[in-house]
Every structure is written in C-alpha cells, then in structure tokens.
A protein has these predicted regions:
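Active-site and donor-binding regions of nucleotide-sugar-utilizing enzymes
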Residues: 3-164
C-alpha cells in the first residue's frame, strides 16, 4: 500500500489538499493518507496527527504567543512522519511551517513536494534558494512560476489554480 503524508495548515489548504487527495485516490486505489489537515481532508481518508486548526494562526498577536506550541508540534510531527516512513510528503501552502518540515524529511530521504508555492516572484525572491533546500518538487498554480523555480534547479509542474 502506498503511503502519502500530506499537510495543510489552514482552511484554504484543507480544500486544495482534499481535491488533490481525491485525484490521487482516483489514480491509485490502494493508498493511505497521513499527516495534518482539516475536515475536508479527513473526509478523503486522512489520518490526521492533529487538527490543522492548531496551525491556522493569523497576525502577530495570534502567532507570537503560540510559537512554543508550534515548535513543539512541528518537532512531534517530524518525528512521527520519520517513524511512519511515507513514500512521499506533500506540503500544501503554509510555507513557514511546511518548508521546515519538508527540509527535515528530505534530509532523511523522504521525497518532498510542495503544492501552492509562495509568491517569490512578488516579494522576497531570495527565498527560492531556501525552497530548493527544502523541497524536491513544486506543483505551481501560476504558469510564470515554472521557469522561475526551474532556473534554480527545482523540478516544477504547472498544474493550474485549484480554485479556478
């Protein structure tokens, strides 16, 4: 049985990841999804390590007091995923949380994918180098992202915007 670890940290990511999970399940029947997500991902069969609401924090006044909790959850999640040994890991959006998880899993030999890359073309373009260290493959939602990521050596497939 194939095992895919997938993580979405907010409601929009839950929707996008659930759509991706449904598509993958239509192609691969014998599959297990583990990771972190919300109700839509759980409907698609996700065995969630914790609910994504723990990561759905917006603005400095929500994030700062929760930093110790976020670091602890991230540590526990990485340990759990390394122990579970998924065939691949897919981080959906939530780059501040996902790229660190991806980097640690990539270092342990788990292939990492990222769906909905941050807008490096709009601001903080040097992040592309950090992304390269974190993820093996990007599913881009905008056509102009593909050459940008491939220029620095990140394999990229343009898949279109999931909500379009």
């Amino acid at each position: 049985m194939a095992k895919i670890a997938i993580l979405a940290g907010e409601p929009s990511g839950d929707l996008i990841a659930a759509q991706l999970m449904a598509y993958i399940r239509s192609k691969i029947k014998n599959i297990e999804f583990i990771g972190v997500g919300g109700p839509l991902m759980k409907q698609e069969g996700l065995s969630s390590f914790f609910d994504h609401s723990n990561l759905s924090l917006y603005g400095v006044f929500q994030v700062i007091p929760n930093i110790p909790k976020l670091i602890f959850l991230r540590y526990k999640l990485i340990k759990y995923l390394k122990n579970e040994k998924p065939d691949i890991f897919i981080g959906v959006d939530a780059p501040d949380f996902n790229f660190y998880v991806e980097k640690k899993l990539k270092q342990s030999g788990i292939p990492t994918f990222h769906y909905v890359a941050p807008s490096v073309w709009a601001w903080r373009p040097k992040r592309v180098h950090k992304i390269k260290k974190s993820t093996d493959y990007i599913f881009s939602i905008f056509p102009h992202e593909k050459p940008l990521f491939e220029k620095v050596g990140i394999q990229t497939t343009f898949v279109g915007h999931p909500l379009a």
